[in-house]
Regions:
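N-terminal glycine-rich dinucleotide-binding loop that anchors FAD/FMN and/or NAD(P) in oxidoreductases
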Residues: 1-11, 126-133
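General small-molecule cofactor/ligand-binding pocket signal
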Residues: 6-8, 76, 142-144
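A conserved short coil-to-beta-strand element within the FAD-binding core of flavoproteins
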Residues: 9-20
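Glycine-centered tight beta-turn/hairpin loop motif at sheet-sheet or coil-to-beta transitions
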Residues: 26-29
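FAD-site-proximal beta/loop scaffold in flavoenzymes
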Residues: 31-103
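Short beta-strand and adjoining strand-loop segment in the mid-core
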Residues: 81-87, 117-124
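Internal hydrophobic alpha-helix adjacent to the cofactor/substrate pocket in enzyme cavities
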Residues: 89-112, 140, 198-199
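Flexible, glycine-rich terminal cap/loop adjacent to redox cofactors
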Residues: 103, 120-130, 135-224
Length: 224
């Protein structure tokens, strides 16, 4: 907002014309005029040619179990076609699980620690559950927040910038969600992936020695 960016969430695009977008939200229809329009509509699975297999569908893709097995014997699926997470790093891990299962190696796919990154300036990254999801599910949780400006390294490298580290924990004090706004969020999010995958607790994170000075120190400091 400080940079003049305006967000319209929970909205549906109805029509696009030269220099104009018509969209609707809970309050009705609206129009936005602009000299440029960037269309980012995502992807959808290509299922052409596999109709004869009669695979059980899931959303717009193919249903798989935690071993990436489909409803048909000796058929596995991985990547965007599973309709879980349309991200390259998710597809890589799904492919590993599928191949390991084919070879009889015990492996299982988990989706509780899939990182997502917006490569903007400043960067935004998140891993695990969000506070909104926990509220909707009625689960007990605790929020830990700290401004990125508590990190001297962040202040030195992002002059005049600000950011936020937000960590969510469950009633067992396990890390279940971690979210960053500010550079270098895309690099720091790997720490969140490890913490959530390993089901680390607040006490365990606090015992980790982070190098100083680094922006990643903010993770431990947020939990102090």
């Amino acid at each position: 907002k400080h940079k003049g960016v305006e967000f319209h969430l929970s909205s549906k695009v109805l029509h696009v014309a030269t220099g104009c977008v018509t969209y609707s939200d809970a309050e009705g229809e609206h129009k936005i005029e602009s000299s440029n329009i960037l269309l980012c509509v995502g992807r959808k699975p290509n299922l052409e040619g596999i109709e004869a297999l009669n695979l059980e569908p899931y959303r717009n893709g193919i249903k798989v179990d935690t071993h990436m097995r489909t409803s048909a014997s000796n058929v596995w699926a991985a990547g965007d076609v599973t309709a879980f997470s349309l991200l390259a790093h998710t597809a890589i891990r799904e492919g590993q699980v599928a191949v390991n299962d084919m070879l009889g190696i015990d492996d299982e796919m988990e989706y509780n620690a899939i990182p997502g990154v917006i490569y903007s300036s400043p960067e935004v990254a998140g891993c695990g559950v969000t506070e909104d999801a926990l509220k909707q599910e009625g689960k007990e949780y605790e929020v830990h927040k700290l401004a990125m400006t508590h990190s001297g390294r962040f202040v030195a490298e992002n002059e005049g910038g600000n950011g936020l580290c937000k960590i969510l924990t469950n009633k067992e004090k396990q890390i279940i969600g971690m979210h960053f706004i500010g550079n270098p969020a895309s690099e720091m999010i790997s720490c969140a992936c490890i913490a959530i995958s390993a089901r680390m607790t607040v006490d365990q994170i606090q015992k980790v020695v982070f190098p100083h000075p680094t922006v990643s120190e903010i993770i431990r400091e947020t939990l102090d």
